[in-house]
């Protein structure tokens, strides 16, 4: 798989380089609440502009319905990217239309153009190969002959989409530094990780993570379960979970996992329950098998944090994906904070699997450099660990 260094050694001055970045940041109105993904895109863009490339960035934001929608505009991202780069970033008013063509034609060496949200074009996410291919053809024409494509949006490499997969069949493709480092870290986890190897999985739904749980259990020493999905596991043990999140249709498969891998699966022993789903709800700590009928579990309890921390302290490799509770509410953030701190304190090779876990690290004020690696792609990380092919990576490995 060719990478950014290979491209730079070829020389990029005056060449157009299309960079697929992951700039899918959370917004409050037009204010970016977590710019982690924008920051993660900087090294690749800066190396290219520093070498004189004419950088054209394509990315998505949210899930627009295949047509322009002002609330999903990349305008706030263009502004923030410009601030971080210390240079103007021109935002094209469309994806491959006249505005994009004009912006790209006007580029000087070392400049950056950000195309408008690629998902404003319905062909980006089409299941029809020909439709996606048509958009990829237009993207290739936009950057012209002699151009290169750098895939640096790890958060989307598990998607077979025009700007991720099909474009690499039309323009010579290279893995950006971000994608390369992410794949190397995941290969470490799936290859020969230092043991003991512990995985912490949180989040709301068992159904979202059943595949990765089944794939990981034969490979890990301990798998710790937190978050909303813990209540389906507790129900599978025969406990009443009150009004906690429960996927009744997953209880049977969860029960089977407990029967086959009960020695590896570790569940909460106590939980923080609330009388309603709200930041100011009344709350108390109860044993995991004593959740009141009208209450809901919104976090793991202090004894669970202590139990999990003890396991993590003795681990040499840790992968964490998904918060332990509703960390956005301060009263229910201590489980997530405790797990994160225990991972940092363990001194292990530690990987935070993107998504809400990465957001939690930042919002709770934990030191990012306390972890070996914070992934920018939650879904992509999980699919890789599950053994699924990542189309955006495999197409680079095949080469054009």
UniProtKB/Swiss-Prot annotation:
Biological source species: Saccharopolyspora erythraea (strain ATCC 11635 / DSM 40517 / JCM 4748 / NBRC 13426 / NCIMB 8594 / NRRL 2338)
The EC number(s) this enzyme carries: 2.7.2.3
Binding site for ATP: 209, 297, 328, 354-357
Localization, UniProt: Cytoplasm
Binding positions for substrate per the UniProt entry: 22-24, 37, 60-63, 119, 159
Keywords (A to Z) from UniProt: ATP-binding, Cytoplasm, Glycolysis, Kinase, Nucleotide-binding, Transferase
GO cellular component: cytosol
Pathway where this protein functions: Carbohydrate degradation; glycolysis; pyruvate from D-glyceraldehyde 3-phosphate: step 2/5
Entry's family note: Belongs to the phosphoglycerate kinase family.
Name of the protein this chain belongs to: Phosphoglycerate kinase
Enzyme superclass (EC): transferase
Subunit structure: Monomer.
GO annotation terms (biological process): gluconeogenesis; glycolytic process
Lineage: Bacteria, Bacillati, Actinomycetota, Actinomycetes, Pseudonocardiales
CDD domains reported for this sequence: Phosphoglycerate_kinase
GO molecular function, one term: phosphoglycerate kinase activity
PANTHER family per UniProt: PHOSPHOGLYCERATE KINASE (PTHR11406), PHOSPHOGLYCERATE KINASE 1, CHLOROPLASTIC-RELATED (PTHR11406:SF23)
InterPro entries given in the database record: Phosphoglycerate_kinase, Phosphoglycerate_kinase_CS, Phosphoglycerate_kinase_N, Phosphoglycerate_kinase_sf
Catalysed reaction equations from the record: (2R)-3-phosphoglycerate + ATP = (2R)-3-phospho-glyceroyl phosphate + ADP
């Amino acid at each position: 798989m060719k990478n950014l260094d290979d491209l730079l050694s070829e020389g990029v001055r005056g060449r157009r380089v299309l960079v697929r970045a992951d700039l899918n940041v959370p917004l409050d109105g037009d204010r970016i609440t977590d710019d982690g993904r924008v920051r993660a895109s900087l090294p690749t863009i800066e190396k290219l502009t520093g070498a004189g490339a004419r950088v054209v960035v394509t990315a998505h934001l949210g899930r627009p319905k295949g047509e322009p929608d002002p609330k999903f505009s990349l305008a706030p991202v263009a502004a923030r990217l410009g601030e971080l780069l210390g240079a103007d970033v021109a935002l094209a008013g469309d994806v491959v239309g006249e505005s994009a063509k004009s912006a790209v034609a006007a580029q000087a060496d070392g400049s950056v153009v950000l195309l408008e949200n690629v998902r404003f074009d319905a062909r980006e996410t089409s299941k029809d190969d020909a439709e996606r291919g048509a958009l990829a053809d237009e993207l290739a024409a936009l950057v012209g002959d002699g151009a290169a494509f750098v895939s640096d949006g790890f958060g989307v490499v598990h998607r077979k989409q025009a700007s991720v997969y099909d474009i690499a069949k039309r323009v010579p493709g290279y893995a950006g530094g971000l994608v390369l480092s992410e794949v190397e870290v995941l290969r470490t986890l799936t290859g020969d990780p230092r043991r003991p190897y512990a995985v912490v999985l949180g989040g709301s739904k068992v159904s979202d993570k059943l595949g990765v749980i089944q794939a990981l259990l034969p490979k890990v020493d301990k798998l710790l379960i937190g978050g909303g999905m813990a209540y389906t596991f507790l129900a599978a043990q025969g406990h009443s979970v009150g009004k906690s999140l429960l996927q009744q249709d997953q209880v049977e498969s969860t029960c089977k996992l407990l029967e086959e891998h009960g020695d590896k699966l570790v569940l909460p022993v106590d939980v923080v329950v609330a009388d309603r789903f709200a930041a100011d709800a009344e709350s108390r700590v109860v044993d995991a098998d004593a959740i009141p009928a009208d209450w809901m579990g919104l976090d793991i309890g202090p004894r669970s944090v202590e139990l999990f921390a003890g396991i993590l302290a003795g681990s040499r490799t840790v992968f964490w994906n998904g918060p332990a509770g509703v960390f956005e509410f301060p009263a229910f953030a201590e489980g997530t904070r405790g797990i994160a701190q225990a991972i940092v304190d363990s001194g292990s090779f530690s990987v935070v699997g993107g998504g809400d876990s990465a957001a939690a690290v930042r919002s709770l004020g934990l030191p990012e450099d306390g972890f070996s690696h914070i992934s920018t792609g939650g879904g992509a990380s999980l699919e890789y660990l599950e053994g699924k092919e990542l189309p955006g990576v495999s197409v680079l490995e095949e080469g054009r």
